[in-house]
C-alpha cells in the first residue's frame, strides 16, 4: 500500500514500558488475508481507516476505539498487538481462530479530538464521533508490522491458561503481554514477511 507522509508537528515523543496491549480489530470477510474492514462488511462504518497502514497511525484518520487506545497510552504500553477472529474467504484450519496478525510500536502520540470534531462539524449528517463525549482522543504513530493469514500468531484459551492469564481468546479480551511473552509474540511476527506493502 502506498505510504502517506503526515506532518508530525505537534506529535509528542512517547516512552512506554516493554508491554504489548491486545486490541481487537474488525477484519474483512471478503479478503483472503486479515485486513481492516474497508468495505464496511461488518456494518460498523468506523473501521474503514484503522489501523492506517498508509500513515503508520491508529486513531488519526478516524475516531474509533478511542477509549481502548487512550487506556493503552495511559498504561504506557509500548506496543499494540492487533488481534482478530478471521472469518474471511480462506478455508484454512485457522478460520475462526483468534489471530494476532500484526503489531505497532508506539513512537509518538497526539490528542486529535479537535480534529475529529471539526471533521464532524463540517459534515454533521455523519455519525457523531466516539470522541465527542470524551476529554481526549489520543492517536498513535509508529512502525507497523503485519503478516499474512497463515503467518499469524494463534492465541488459544489453552495458551492463555498456560501463560497464567485468565479469560478466553475473544473480541472482549483485554490483556497486556510483558517480558518473555511479548518477546515471543514479537519475535514470531518479525520472523514472518511484512505484508503492508502487498
What are these regions (language model features)?
Residues 88-90, 109-114:
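Eukaryotic short linear interaction motifs
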Residues 1-31, 111-198:
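Contiguous surface segments at macromolecular interaction interfaces
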Residues 75, 99, 114-115:
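Elongated alpha-helical scaffolds
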Residues 20-89:
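Short N-terminal edge-element motif at the start of the domain
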Amino acid at each position: 500500500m502506498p505510504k502517506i507522509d503526515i506532518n508530525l508537528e505537534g506529535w509528542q515523543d512517547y516512552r512506554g514500558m516493554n508491554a504489548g496491549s491486545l486490541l481487537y480489530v474488525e477484519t474483512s470477510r471478503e479478503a483472503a488475508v486479515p485486513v481492516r474492514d474497508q468495505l464496511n462488511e461488518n456494518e460498523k462504518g468506523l473501521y474503514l481507516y484503522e489501523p492506517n497502514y498508509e500513515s503508520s497511525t491508529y486513531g488519526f484518520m478516524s475516531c474509533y476505539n478511542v477509549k481502548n487506545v487512550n487506556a493503552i497510552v495511559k498504561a504506557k504500553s509500548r506496543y499494540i498487538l492487533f488481534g482478530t477472529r478471521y472469518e474471511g474467504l480462506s478455508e484454512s484450519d485457522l478460520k475462526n481462530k483468534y489471530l494476532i496478525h500484526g503489531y505497532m510500536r508506539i513512537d509518538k502520540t497526539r490528542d486529535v479530538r479537535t480534529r475529529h470534531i471539526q471533521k464532524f462539524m463540517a459534515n454533521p449528517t455523519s455519525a457523531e464521533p466516539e470522541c465527542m463525549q470524551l476529554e481526549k482522543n489520543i492517536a498513535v504513530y509508529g512502525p507497523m508490522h503485519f503478516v499474512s493469514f497463515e503467518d499469524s500468531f494463534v492465541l488459544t484459551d489453552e495458551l492463555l491458561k498456560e501463560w497464567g492469564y485468565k479469560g478466553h481468546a475473544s473480541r472482549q479480551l483485554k490483556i497486556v503481554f510483558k517480558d518473555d511473552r511479548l518477546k515471543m509474540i514479537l519475535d514470531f511476527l518479525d520472523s514472518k514477511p511484512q505484508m503492508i506493502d502487498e
